[in-house]
Structure formats: structure tokens, C-alpha cells
Swiss-Prot record:
Pfam families noted in UniProt: Abhydrolase_1
GO MF term list: homoserine O-acetyltransferase activity
Name this polypeptide is given: Homoserine O-acetyltransferase
Function noted in UniProt: Transfers an acetyl group from acetyl-CoA to L-homoserine, forming acetyl-L-homoserine.
Subunit composition and interactions: Homodimer.
Organism this protein belongs to: Symbiobacterium thermophilum (strain DSM 24528 / JCM 14929 / IAM 14863 / T)
Designated gene of the protein: metXA
Length: 383
């Protein structure tokens, strides 16, 4: 007999106003945002106690569409469909899974492309700098509106892992556990360096127009180039040998191509650059990469070590063997610092060749550890 077809998980974007003139969002910088909307999606149902929710935090160019489809005929599901859904590790029959687009983003949440209520035109570079802590504080307001009393867990990869750690330090009693994947409580110097080169590609594009390029093509070449460099940091040498090797693009003979695309790996990078330009705002790219640079769990908390002592949640830190952007010593350090202050933390390493993007491309490698961790948290909650 043929297996029954798997039902399509349908979802929709929702919007919540989390800051108003009467209740502004005060940022770490001291600046205020008086009108903030977050775009979010919900999968599964929140239980009456309000304690079965899992917050998924997305990476740099992600959005709220973590899983499912908006329509049955959508060609592609959300960006982490392997992880979220009925019977999956983040089981929507069991948990209420919530994902929001971050503050400063461009996929429905307030960011530099949003209209500045003071001027009636897009903020552009008048938008204040935001930090990961600011993102988390905005998310906390959203969860309050949704009736979430206590999170079962916060999970995310890359920038999402930074958010998970910030959640545990800012709101120590609001979750039972966190699962930061390929991230850290502060960005390392090489990561900041990668981000600065990407930003310069955007800032030096003649189409940038001081950040007020809305209504024009914008800095398309700069954003595409930034994405090309970013993609290099998301993969590994091993994965590039496997996927591309030194293979020429099509029938091209590299000896006769001059500086045109000659190799498959070059073609891939150009393709990724073009794809991002179609769906992402260059200003958001600037703001979110800077938020990663500014990430420092210890800021205002005495020291980096003291910040980890604030964490009461259980921690499952996931490293990726081949990660160039967030090397595994960073996740091991997180575990050591939490344990040093008496907290509970464990480390799991993905033995994947796919580099930083392995949490998206090789999720089955960590499905069982995550499923087990969540079930243990649930058992503790019900004990």
C-alpha cells in the first residue's frame, strides 16, 4: 500500500505592533522607536498554561517563514521545513512554534526600509542602530501579546544563535532551555572583518545614494557582491571541492574566458548574489551585520563571564566541524562558561562538511539531539 500523503503545513504572515508613542521601544543606544511592528508566523497551538512555545530565531537574511507554505501550490516551503512541522523535531502537534522577522529586517518588521513617521518617507540611514539585545526585547513584547508565559526553548542558528543566548541572559527566567547553533555570545574579530568588507561593497556602490535609494534600482551590485562574500563564509573548502571542484562553467575554457565567469563556483556565487538582491534590502544588510558585530553578551553586565552566569536555562550548544564563520571553539567556550557558574550545558558537534550553513543543509545530523533535549525540557516542566 502507498503511504498516505503528508498534509501540507499552511501558514500566514501576521503582524503585531510592539511599540507605540505611548510605549516606545528604548534601544541600547538610548534612542527610541515609537512605532514598531514585527512580522511573525505561528505553527501549532499555545497551551492554556502558555508554556509550550518554542521561539525560532532566524539568521542574517532569514525571515518569519521558517516552515510550511502560504499556499498549497507554493514551490518551496519555509527555510527550516526539515525541522518544524508535525512529527518533526520541533513538533507542531506538541509545541507552539513562533518565528518573527527581527527588528531592523525587511520582511515585514520595522527596519530602515519602513516609513519614518516623522518624515513620511523611508528611514534609510536615519534608522537607529539596533543590537541583538534590542531585537530580543522587541520579541519579548511580541510574546507578551501572544500570551506566552514561559518559553520551552529558544533556538536559532548564526545570528539566531546570538539571539538565543541574548534571550537567556536578558530574560533568565523566561525559558527552560536554549539551543544556539553555530553562534556565540560575541562576534570574533575575523567575523567583524568579513562583515566590514561586505558593508563596504554596498556603501561604495554609486546606487547607494546615501541610503535613500528607495524608488531607484538601489545598490544592486554592492549587495550582490556582499552576498557573494557572505556565501564563501557560509561554506567550507571541503564542501566547495565536493560541489564544484575546479570544474569550468558549461563548455567554457578558462584559458579563453578572460575575466568572465569561467568556473562553476564563480557562477554559483553570482547566482546567489542575484537571488538576494531580489528579496532583501541593502540597508537591512548593513544594520543586521553591524548588529552581529555589536553582539557582546557581557556589555553592561560586568564581564563576558558574568553574563554567562546569568543564564538559568539549560543549554544545548551545537557546533559545526567545518564552520569558518563561527568556529567550534566558540560553542565550546559557551558551554565551559555556563558550567563554570554552575549552569547546565552540553555540546554537540555536527560532523558536516557543509560549513556554517550545515544547520540548514544537514539538519538530520542534529535532529535527534534536539528532539531529545526538547523532550527532556518538557518532562522537567511537567515534573
Amino acid at each position: 500500500m502507498n503511504a498516505a500523503p503528508v498534509p501540507i503545513l499552511l501558514t500566514q504572515r501576521r503582524y503585531a505592533r510592539v511599540a507605540t508613542p505611548e510605549n516606545p521601544l528604548v534601544l541600547e543606544s538610548g534612542q527610541r522607536l515609537t512605532d514598531v511592528t514585527l512580522c511573525y508566523e505561528v505553527f501549532g497551538r499555545l497551551n492554556p498554561a502558555g508554556d509550550n512555545a518554542i521561539l525560532v530565531c532566524h539568521a542574517l537574511t532569514g525571515d518569519s517563514h521558517v516552515a510550511g507554505r502560504y499556499r498549497p501550490d507554493d514551490p518551496k516551503p519555509g527555510w527550516w521545513d526539515d525541522a518544524v512541522g508535525p512529527g518533526k523535531a520541533l513538533d507542531t502537534d506538541r509545541y507552539c512554534v513562533i518565528c518573527s522577522n527581527v527588528l531592523g529586517g525587511c520582511q515585514g518588521s520595522t527596519g530602515p526600509s519602513s516609513v519614518n513617521p516623522a518624515t513620511g518617507r523611508p528611514y534609510g540611514l536615519d534608522f537607529p542602530l539596533v543590537t541583538v539585545r534590542d531585537m530580543v526585547r522587541a520579541q519579548a513584547r511580541l510574546l507578551d501579546l501572544l500570551g506566552v508565559r514561559r518559553l520551552l526553548a529558544v533556538i536559532g542558528g548564526s545570528l539566531g544563535a546570538m539571539q538565543a543566548l541574548e534571550w537567556a541572559a536578558t530574560y533568565p527566567d523566561r525559558m527552560r532551555g536554549i539551543i544556539p547553533i553555530g553562534g556565540a555570545g560575541r562576534f570574533h574579530p575575523q567575523g567583524i572583518a568579513f562583515n566590514e568588507v561586505q558593508r563596504q561593497a554596498i556603501l561604495n556602490d554609486p546606487g547607494f545614494l546615501g541610503g535613500q535609494y528607495y524608488g531607484t534600482p538601489g545598490p544592486v551590485r554592492g549587495l550582490a557582491t556582499a552576498r557573494m562574500l557572505g556565501m564563501i563564509t557560509y561554506r567550507s573548502d571541503e564542501s566547495m571541492w565536493t560541489q564544484f571542484g575546479r570544474n569550468p562553467q558549461g563548455e567554457a575554457n578558462p584559458l579563453h574566458q578572460g575575466f568572465a565567469v569561467a568556473y562553476q563556483v564563480e557562477s554559483y556565487l553570482h547566482y546567489q548574489g542575484r537571488k538576494l538582491v531580489e528579496r532583501f534590502d541593502a540597508n537591512s544588510y548593513l544594520y543586521l551585520t553591524r548588529a552581529m558585530d555589536l553582539m557582546d553578551l557581557g556589555r553592561g553586565r560586568g564581564s563576558y563571564e558574568e553574563a554567562h552566569a546569568r543564564i538559568q536555562a539549560r543549554v544545548l550548544a551545537v557546533g559545526i566541524r567545518s564552520d569558518l564563520l563561527f568556529p567550534t571553539y566558540l560553542q565550546r567556550e559557551t558551554v565551559e562558561l555556563v558550567r563554570a557558574s554552575g549552569g547546565r550545558a552540553e555540546y554537540v558537534e555536527m560532523d558536516s562538511p557543509w560549513g556554517h550553513d550545515a544547520f540548514l543543509l544537514d539538519f538530520p545530523l542534529i535532529e535527534e539531539p534536539i528532539r531529545r533535549f526538547l523532550q527532556e525540557l518538557e518532562a522537567e516542566e511537567n515534573a
